[in-house]
């Protein structure tokens, strides 16, 4: 990718061309909804893995695109559109972030304070 945003739109196009239901989640969704820190890995929920991924290819580790196939369609409930990109609900973003390693807990707290307004 030329930059992170370029990667978002390229992945968006690949998934749409393959008729894959998806929504950006975790750090990527938070980057779009309530940016707090730089991101370098694109994360999304997909209802299935696409057969054709263009210039993307699977790797064992250290990839820059991570696709999750959730156990339930509930992960897509409340999906929102930001900059013409699908993003999971704010609550789902928060739940994703608090379960992820690294500084994602900081991002979750920032999202909670600025968007969710919980106690």
Locations of the language-model features?
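C-terminal regulatory/effector modules of DNA-binding transcriptional regulators
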Residues: 51, 55-119
